[in-house]
């Protein structure tokens, strides 16, 4: 996936198009992400015991990962990302793979 938990993203499609948020959870098995404050749905919940009453609760539903675009931390624009290998190696001796911004060519992953 082109985004990770904690990334700042811009929603580019759907009812929340144009809004920004931070990724709370990434679900790579189904290619979806949960974004803070975006795609709010109302859930009708039955009571689940003495400490958890029922009612209508609002929660964030997952969005498809293709409907969000990463906001580059260095240039501040929503841009496409790519992956490249660095000269330095990881703990197993392989070249380190990082994401980079295609607009400003800056490395996103530290």
Swiss-Prot record:
One of two assembly initiator proteins, it binds directly to the 5'-end of the 23S rRNA, where it nucleates assembly of the 50S subunit. One of the proteins that surrounds the polypeptide exit tunnel on the outside of the subunit. This is Large ribosomal subunit protein uL24. Keywords: Ribonucleoprotein, Ribosomal protein, RNA-binding, rRNA-binding. Part of the 50S ribosomal subunit. It comes from Chloroflexus aurantiacus (strain ATCC 29364 / DSM 637 / Y-400-fl). Belongs to the universal ribosomal protein uL24 family. It comes from the Bacteria. SMART domains: KOW. The keyword Transport does not apply. One of its GO terms (biological process) is translation. GO terms for molecular function: rRNA binding; structural constituent of ribosome. NCBIfam families: rplX_bact (TIGR01079).
